[in-house]
């Protein structure tokens, strides 16, 4: 059976690969969006990092950073390093016992979850937004082939 640890390692690898690939596209891609009112590419890329920091906060208590908006390749590559660091923290969290975590949500209420749930959500969350990102880029004439970053590709490159 695949473990959450392997899924986290795949997530971290694919995050790095996708940040690299985006950095090779034209600078203007950061303002592309699926439709009026939807998030542009730059905001989605920021959301990968912000969300990773949120999951890290839930598990470790480390406060969130004041991250710059991703509007160009230079900032994207800085944030690639940041998400790489946070992804390593999430991978390390897998080795700890699953336990209940209590946190205050955006609604001001106390919520309960578990370490396994937070780690699983981190994995699923990135997958969801990678699909969104790929669709925006394809609709705008750019190609982000997510099959290049699937679990089989990860396995073949990390044996």
Range-by-range predicted roles:
Residues 61-97:
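Helix-adjacent hinge/juxtasegments
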Residues 5-20, 24-69, 107-159:
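Short, contiguous alpha-helical
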Residues 94-108:
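Acidic catalytic patch
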